[in-house]
């Protein structure tokens, strides 16, 4: 199951191919991704972050073993072969425990790595870039690399213990700013310099040697860098290839290495393709997929209001707003401005903090109510044209069933299609 190593080999041979990573735990997003990969007969890379999923449950309430079981069960139900499914762990390190002393945070990180590897995750992003309670700010490359090497050793031992061989594929390094979109308004972003990328690589190579891990270097397939892409609440910084030329050329000197780009959400299809051509050949996407889910649900809620008496409506949007106001912890520190600005951000921000609320039981009940209301009788075509125009074209051509669920999934797949096209290669 060396899909990633083979992808890198082909890319280094000039194929200009890549792979996208679906970073979401939402069942409809995952179903959309599995069905899309199945239809296109491609492997599928699904990643969990250290915030979402950890040995204590993360914010999803799932351990790595739970997440794997959930994804594999979904794949089985959709007849997707498990050997075409790659599970990755993103930003694995002391990220969740920065408020603890480094010794304690790293002990937790050891256990985090063990839980991911034992559960069968094969793509492991080692990220120890964050300072803990008693650390200097920022950490030196050497400290970051030493901690990553420590975790790599734990990962290798765990993999051999559980699977009889060490076949993990690693990603190292980190992008700045923090995972999940920038908190501030952006105008321009500094691209990682070739010297900084080389320093990260050399520090890691040296630290891995000290741990006796020379042999795993060919399995370090990617370095996370900042190619100059990011988004905030209402803006996207588009990829500018010319600004990343030196960085792109630098990786050509490394035989088994490509770059991984985070926060590629909302880039244009042309930018996504150019990123892959420029060796940023692993494209991470998450918020853009749940943003598309939210768009589809808001559109269906508007259709429901046209068709269903007010008393019988799901009230999905109002339920969502009420829950977000009752439990503001996932958006309050991100969204600023007056009451109206924050209301708009809660519903529409590119950073899509609303994604943290979909599992809430009240919201889930309203979602189920919405789907029931619209599944009772066919949705009139003019309303699909009004609120989901891209799906309307497919409904009219006969390639899409106009049921609520299929409309949602297809809308998400429109985003996946952009990533698929960007990664196809020549």
From Swiss-Prot:
Question: Which pathway features in its UniProt record?
Answer: Carbohydrate metabolism; D-tagatose 6-phosphate degradation; D-glyceraldehyde 3-phosphate and glycerone phosphate from D-tagatose 6-phosphate: step 2/2
User: Which is a Gene Ontology cellular component entry for this protein?
Assistant: plasma membrane
State any GO BP term from the record: carbohydrate metabolic process
A single Pfam family, by name? GatZ_KbaZ-like
Cross-referenced Gene3D superfamilies:
Aldolase class I (3.20.20.70), putative tagatose 6-phosphate kinase domain like (1.10.400.20)
Classification via InterPro entries: Aldolase_TIM (IPR013785), GatZ/KbaZ-like (IPR012062), GatZ_KbaZ_carbometab (IPR050303), TagBP_ald_KbaZ (IPR023435)
Domain of life, per UniProt, equals Bacteria
Q: Which family does it belong to?
A: Belongs to the GatZ/KbaZ family. KbaZ subfamily.
Q: List, alphabetically, the NCBIfam families matched.
A: agaZ_gatZ, PRK15458.1
Q: What does this protein do?
A: Component of the tagatose-1,6-bisphosphate aldolase KbaYZ that is required for full activity and stability of the Y subunit. Could have a chaperone-like function for the proper and stable folding of KbaY. When expressed alone, KbaZ does not show any aldolase activity.
Its quaternary organisation is: Forms a complex with KbaY.
**PANTHER family per the UniProt record, alphabetical:** D-TAGATOSE-1,6-BISPHOSPHATE ALDOLASE SUBUNIT KBAZ, N-ACETYLGALACTOSAMINE PERMEASE II COMPONENT-RELATED
Full protein name: D-tagatose-1,6-bisphosphate aldolase subunit KbaZ
Biological source species: Escherichia coli O81 (strain ED1a)
């Amino acid at each position: 199951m060396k899909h990633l190593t083979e992808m890198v080999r082909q890319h280094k041979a000039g194929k200009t191919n890549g792979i996208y990573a679906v970073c979401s735990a939402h069942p409809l997003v995952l179903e959309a991704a599995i069905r899309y990969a199945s239809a296109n007969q491609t492997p599928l890379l699904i990643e969990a972050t250290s915030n979402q999923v950890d040995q204590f449950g993360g914010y999803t309430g799932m351990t790595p073993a739970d997440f794997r079981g959930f994804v594999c069960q979904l794949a089985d139900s959709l007849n997707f072969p498990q050997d075409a499914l790659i599970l990755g762990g993103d930003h694995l390190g002391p990220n969740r425990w920065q408020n603890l002393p480094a010794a304690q945070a790293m002990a937790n990180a050891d256990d985090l790595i063990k839980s991911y590897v034992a559960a069968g995750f094969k793509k492991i992003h080692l990220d120890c870039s964050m300072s803990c309670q008693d650390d200097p700010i920022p950490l030196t490359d050497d400290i970051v690399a030493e901690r990553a090497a420590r975790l790599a050793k734990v990962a290798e031992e765990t993999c051999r213990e559980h699977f009889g061989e060490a076949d993990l594929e690693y990603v190292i390094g980190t992008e700045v700013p923090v995972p999940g979109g920038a908190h501030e308004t952006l105008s321009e972003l500094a691209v990682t310099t070739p010297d900084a990328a080389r320093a990260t690589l050399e520090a890691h190579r040296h630290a891995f040697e000290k741990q006796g891990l020379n042999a795993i270097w060919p399995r370090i397939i990617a370095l996370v860098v900042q190619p100059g892409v990011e988004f905030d609440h209402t803006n996207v910084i588009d990829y500018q290839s010319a600004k990343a030329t030196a960085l792109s050329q630098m990786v050509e000197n490394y035989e088994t290495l490509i770059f991984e780009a985070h926060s590629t959400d909302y880039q244009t299809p042309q930018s996504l393709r150019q990123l892959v051509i420029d060796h940023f050949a692993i494209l991470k996407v998450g918020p853009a997929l749940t943003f598309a889910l939210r768009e589809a649900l808001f559109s269906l809620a508007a259709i429901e209001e046209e068709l269903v008496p007010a008393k019988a409506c799901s009230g999905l949007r109002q339920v969502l707003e009420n829950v977000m106001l009752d439990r503001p912890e996932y958006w309050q520190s991100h969204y600023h401005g007056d009451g109206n600005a924050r209301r708009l951000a809660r519903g529409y921000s590119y950073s899509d903090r609303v994604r943290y609320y979909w599992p809430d039981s009240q919201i889930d009940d309203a979602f189920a109510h919405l789907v029931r209301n619209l599944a009772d009788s066919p949705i009139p075509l003019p309303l699909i044209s009004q609120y989901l125009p891209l799906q309307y074209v497919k409904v009219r051509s006969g390639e899409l069933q106009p049921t609520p669920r299929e409309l949602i999934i297809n809308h998400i797949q429109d985003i996946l299609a952009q990533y698929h096209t960007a990664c196809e290669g020549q």
